Amino acid sequence: MVRYSKLAFRQLVRVYDVDVCFTPMIYAKNFIESEKCRSSELSVCEGDSPLIVQFATDDPFVLSEAAEMVYKCSTGVDLNCGCPKHDVRSKGFGSALLSKPELLADMVRQTRARIPDPDFSVSLKIRINHDIEKTVDLCRKAEAAGVTHLTVHGRTPSQRAEPIDIQALRIVKDSVSVPIIANGGITTREEALFLAEQTGVDGIMAANGLLDNPALFAGHEHTPSDCVENFMRLSREYGLDWLLYHQHLQYMLRPVFSAQQRRVFNELNGRLAIDHFLNNLLDI
């Protein structure tokens, strides 16, 4: 998730049965060249594990260099090959890479050569192609290059809210031997279990669903009040920017706000005002 899966939020979802966390997508070249980028984009703590750092690049050397820089503070790197946003695609990153399976295989190969540690994962996050055989070919090339696992979003780059393609996910799972993580449209624990049962995949990733409900995988239908309280505490502890703090809470509390409460909350300015509003709302 671009911007959102910072340290405080990762530590929050770990409380509610998330097994592995990913960082926000980070531009690998900026990360290598800028100390400011590294300090703002990647903060970790002792309990922030397993952690996979997700990068955006189209350069095998840059990916392997960035991977080496995070080797000691993470459990793996992931290359974003699925982001459909125009500003990402225009750089040749994200889903623009799906048409270049040989390049992706080379990026995996060079990164694995730089870090041969089998406990450090090198993975790809992709979207499916309208021609599923092209997706299978990409996955097989990545597998041959040494990819640790693949996260497959069950929509094409041009799709947004359409139902995910369960059959396509099943075909990909049956075509390779590396673990497959399915992604797309998960909003409840029941949906995650159903998708795993229908496709046989090895794991389920949620993104937007966790923004709305960080306790999703623990079986909560909506964000429970203790989750909000935990997020308030963790955000203070890890210094989460108040604007991002505000945005997270807008997602989490959307189902419980009245229209009037939503208008008031959206106009709040600063952490103190936000916390005062929440203390009254939650009777903390």
Swiss-Prot record:
**Known cofactor(s):** FMN
The residues that the entry says bind FMN are 54, 125, 153, 183-185, 207-208
Has the keyword Cell division been applied to this entry?
no
Q: What is its EC number?
A: 1.3.1.-
Against PROSITE patterns, the record matches this protein to: UPF0034 (PS01136)
Q: Which Gene3D superfamilies match?
A: Aldolase class I
CDD domains of this UniProt entry? DUS_like_FMN
Enumerate the Pfam families for this protein.
Dus
Which Gene Ontology molecular function entries are recorded, alphabetically? Answer: flavin adenine dinucleotide binding; tRNA dihydrouridine synthase activity
**Annotated catalytic residues:** 83 (proton donor)
Q: Has UniProt tagged this entry with the keyword Oxidoreductase?
A: yes
List keywords of the entry alphabetically.
Flavoprotein, FMN, Oxidoreductase, tRNA processing
- Its domain of life reads Eukaryota
Regarding protein family, the annotation reads:
Belongs to the Dus family.
Report the protein's function.
Catalyzes the synthesis of dihydrouridine, a modified base found in the D-loop of most tRNAs.
Q: Provide the protein name.
A: Uncharacterized tRNA-dihydrouridine synthase-like protein C45G9.2
The organism that produces this protein has a lineage beginning with: Eukaryota, Metazoa, Ecdysozoa, Nematoda, Chromadorea
